[in-house]
Amino acid sequence: MARLIFVLGNPGTGKTTSLRNLKKEEVAYITVTGKELPFRSTINPVQVKSMDDVHKAVVASKKSIVVIDDTNYLFTKAVFGASEKDDKWDVYDKASKDFYKIVEAILNKDTQQNFYLFGHLEDVESKTLALKTLGQATRRNNNPEGWTNIVFESLVDMDEFVFKVKTDGSGVKSPMEMFDTETVPNDLRVVNDKINKYYKGDK
């Protein structure tokens, strides 16, 4: 089964730059905003405009690592791109259901792919880590982080860009003994290898 992994954090904390050591042959980079990569790379970004586009990309993806960047803006596009004639509750409800379809498509894949969903925080002042989704429909009906046991936080610690990786009650979580330290450098190649080795029973 494919794995769903969230990497959440404030803008500019090193989520996208964590791809810097990956090659285009091993990663599919799906961007919601269309922003160019913040480093020199041969990785070819694939821009999507809707949750339906993401769903199709997930189903069609073959590469072992798939990154969906700025996931939270899928909700922004769904809500602010809707017609003013649409019932607002229906708009939020549809966004919630469409996002669930993406999660379902990932978890239903009979592959060893790792899907990383990068996103901003719901509330930067909150002590609980959560994906920004707009409105309450998604969080009430389909708590995104509940579908996985791997949620990382991107942050800057002592001028170093890192991922917070060990379960600590804040919403950050990972399986027992997957990581030896509270934080790791924001290098997705290293992190991905660590996850794969863990599930293969290697150290």
Over which residues does each language-model region extend?
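P-loop/Walker A phosphate-binding loop and immediately adjacent motor/lid segment at beta-alpha junctions
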Residues: R40-V46, V54, E160-K203
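P-loop NTPase motor core
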Residues: D70-N143
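Phosphate-binding/switch region of NTP-binding enzymes
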Residues: F115-H120, E125-P185
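Structured loop/turn residues at beta-strand edges in well-structured enzyme cores
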Residues: S61, T111, G146
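Generic detector of well-ordered alpha-helical segments enriched in charged/polar residues
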Residues: D52-H55, N72-F75, D93, K97-Y100, ...
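Conserved P-loop
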Residues: M1-S61, I65-V67, N72-Y73
